[in-house]
């Protein structure tokens, strides 16, 4: 698995987008997974690949956060930790070149263990590659007893411009 934290790819220039495509082709050639670029990484109770602050104490009783934006994930962490909210996992997918919010939600659905996994999922979404898959796995998790709170950014014209300049997210369907 690869996590590319740095920015300066498809969200900034055409050359950056071409570099993203080359990276994705290499990752796919070797059957690897890619989170990012332009993200803060991921952390859970057994693995930490986040290189920003704050890093909260993680708890199996905490919530799962999936964010398109690393900056928004950090803002949520800073705000929540001071109020005592605990996290089980934090996933930042950034430009989501290979793995997007719906992929992480699918993973959480497919591996859900009611004895060990959080029943609360927080989603901050700038783009959705496959709205139907997101809805399928969100519905499945709800049937398993989970609660999901989601914010879809970039719905207005100005919000769409902000999301595009931030993570390179192209305005996607808000149907989910």
Each model region followed by its residue ranges:
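Catalytic-core regions of core metabolic enzymes
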Residues: 1-176
């Amino acid at each position: 698995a690869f996590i590319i934290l740095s920015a300066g790819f498809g969200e900034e220039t055409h050359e950056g987008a071409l570099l993203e495509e080359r990276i994705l082709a290499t990752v796919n050639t070797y059957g690897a997974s890619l989170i990012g670029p332009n993200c803060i990484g991921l952390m859970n109770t057994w693995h930490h690949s986040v290189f920003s602050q704050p890093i909260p104490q993680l708890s199996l009783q905490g919530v799962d956060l999936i964010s398109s934006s690393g900056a928004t994930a950090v803002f949520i962490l800073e705000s929540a930790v001071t109020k005592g909210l605990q996290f089980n996992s934090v996933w930042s997918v950034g430009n989501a070149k290979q793995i997007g919010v719906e992929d992480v939600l699918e993973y959480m659905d497919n591996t859900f263990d009611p004895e060990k996994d959080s029943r609360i999922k927080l989603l901050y979404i700038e783009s959705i590659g496959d709205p139907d898959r997101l809805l399928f796995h969100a519905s499945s998790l709800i049937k398993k007893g989970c609660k999901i709170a989601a914010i879809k950014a970039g719905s207005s014209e100005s919000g769409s411009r902000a999301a595009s300049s931030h993570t390179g997210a192209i305005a996607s369907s808000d149907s989910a």
